[in-house]
Amino acid sequence: MSSDIHSEKILILDFGSQYTQLIARRVREAHVYCELHPFDMDLAAIRAFAPRGIILSGGPKSVYEEGAPAVEEALFELGVPVLGICYGMQLMSRHFGGQVVPAGKREFGHADLLAVGTPGPLFDGFFVEGKSPVWMSHGDHVSLVPAGFQVVGETANAPVCAIQDLARNLYGVQFHPEVNHTPRGELLIDTFVRKICGCSGQWTPGHIIDDAVSRIRAQVGNDRVILGLSGGVDSSVAAALIHRAIGDQLTCVFVDNGLLRLSEGDQVMATFAENLGVKVIRVDAEDRFLTALAGESDPEKKRKIIGKLFVDIFEEESNKITDARWLAQGTIYPDVIESAGAKTGKAHNIKSHHNVGGLPDYMKLKLLEPLRELFKDEVRAIGEELGLPHQMVWRHPFPGPGLGVRILGEVKKEYADILRRADAIYIEELYAAGHYDKISQAFAVFLPVKSVGVMGDGRTYEYVVALRAVETKDFMTAGWYPLPYEDMARISSRIINEVKGVNRVVYDISSKPPATIEWE
């Protein structure tokens, strides 16, 4: 497969909306390639990118404020369809002579969009009996529609909520079609990229694999490649994909740091070394990691220690493979976006990432990142296509530092062993009760505090384990999962009875925000 799957592409310009990555994911779900770039992308770069269409995202600013984010005026003269969402619609309206003012009544949440006049092809199937439920999030609105544009949607509080200029192929919506709270929003984005922009939908798992295999072979040639295999989804799929491309030229290094889930090391070896025939070097480094972490309780310092030691051990092993020229990583597109944002100052680096930018300059290997264009759901889809086990591909996210950041405070072997067993019981019960696939992320946390208990006729003074389970579509916000009481009771009873050293189990009912999903 050639690079044809990239020939039809959509450009998304980001004005700072919390939902911008969701726009990209919806475009990809329509089987069309897209990239996300800052709103101030140079016009020459946009021309070179040659998009079939452009989407302007929402954003937190007001278009009439001094210094408000804007695009080069010639953007609208490129002759490709443009869809403005929320701030993007207001920006486009103002550019063509319309007016944007503060709304008398701000709209946040659900609203009914009512069809006005004759909505164009973008809205085919979007309105049912003249209306469509949508999700609003705006404090400004368009008060005067620019010449050439027609209003095709309104709500009770905003008379201009959807506009179109069919002659110039320009469209704007005040609502957010990218979020799940707009039920037919996915259809609207699909219609824009497929019907309005004319993309045929070549971005499919099979085509992505064929394209990646061709590119890996062209990039690597006959060179040797090494990859740090963690057992997580991203590195596992990267390993399977690279092995599909170059076979025995790939050697994986699996560093068992003593902070993995129960029996995870054996499972990784069984999947890759035994079933797929991948060359895997397993390094038992538990003692080195626990020694390095001794006495350290600061979460960020623990992350740095674990990350640095992993690189040190990986380098030791890679030096033994003297003819290796490439280092492969399971970097995915959100990692790339987040790291770029941190460099440009347009995003905050909340937690250090275990993967992107973590390699020292003295490692002279060239970088191979076959997943760097893909979102997590796309990675999972190609993982299944490559034949990886369903449970491995669809397992919940696991942090790079492993249990090191699920043990609060200092990491000790005793704590890790307790947490491993408690977590395994928790996950086993979630599977058995049919909850696991409904939950976005679930895990146990070890709390280094003891509480008084009673077992039999004796008093106990043992540790506390917290259970966390959340539901989320994007991991930017998350709600706690309402696990039924009878399931909580069964899980708690099993952990207390089967895991020595625990006499109390608690359930975390914090949402994100204000809490993060992980405890550290």
UniProtKB/Swiss-Prot annotation:
Q: Which reaction does it catalyse?
A: XMP + L-glutamine + ATP + H2O = GMP + L-glutamate + AMP + diphosphate + 2 H(+)
Instruction: Give the matching PROSITE patterns.
Output: GATASE_TYPE_1, GMPS_ATP_PPASE
The residues the record assigns to binding ATP are S230, G231, G232, V233, D234, S235, S236
SUPFAM superfamilies, A to Z: Adenine nucleotide alpha hydrolases-like, Class I glutamine amidotransferase-like, GMP synthetase C-terminal dimerisation domain
Mention one GO molecular function. GMP synthase activity
In this chain the GMPS ATP-PPase domain maps to 203-395
Glutamine amidotransferase type-1 domain: which residues?
A: 9-202
Q: Which UniProt keywords apply?
A: ATP-binding, Glutamine amidotransferase, GMP biosynthesis, Ligase, Nucleotide-binding, Purine biosynthesis
Q: Which GO terms describe its cellular component?
A: cytosol
Q: In which pathway does it act?
A: Purine metabolism; GMP biosynthesis; GMP from XMP (L-Gln route): step 1/1
Stated EC number for the protein is 6.3.5.2
Q: What class of enzyme is it?
A: ligase
Question: Do the record's keywords include Iron?
Answer: no
InterPro entries for the chain? Class_I_gatase-like, GATASE, GMP_synth_C, GMP_synth_GATase, GMP_synthase, GMPS_ATP_PPase_dom, NAD/GMP_synthase, Rossmann-like_a/b/a_fold
List the active site: C86 (nucleophile), H176, E178
Q: How does it assemble?
A: Homodimer.
Q: What job does the chain carry out?
A: Catalyzes the synthesis of GMP from XMP.
- This chain belongs to the protein called GMP synthase [glutamine-hydrolyzing]
